[in-house]
Amino acid sequence: MPGYSKEDGNILKQFGAAVKAGRDGLGISQETLAEKAGPHRTYVGGVEQGRRNVSLLNIVKLSQALGVEAASVFEHMKTIKILKIIKWIYLAVIMIFVF
């Protein structure tokens, strides 16, 4: 991701995944979320793909459009990270027993 460290890029991707999970949970399109939150649909797509560094105002607007507190989006990011760690542990255990 140009201009961002790998760690920063991962944060943006995790935030985007949290927004996408919230949107999917509501069963709404990127366009509908954009209409509710204010930014353009392509901006929402960029956020979900981890390509946009989201401002504090847009974090609040997206959260409100999803019907959640902004803090809950960050809590979801922790869950995503924990699930990735569990996945890597699982794969490591499989590798140990297979090889």
Language-model regions, residue ranges each:
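Short, charged recognition helix plus adjacent turn
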Residues: 1-4, 9, 64, 72-99
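Conserved hydrophobic/aromatic packing and binding residues within compact polymer-binding modules
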Residues: 19, 33-34, 44-47, 73
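Recognition helix of helix-turn-helix/homeodomain-like DNA-binding domains
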Residues: 38-54
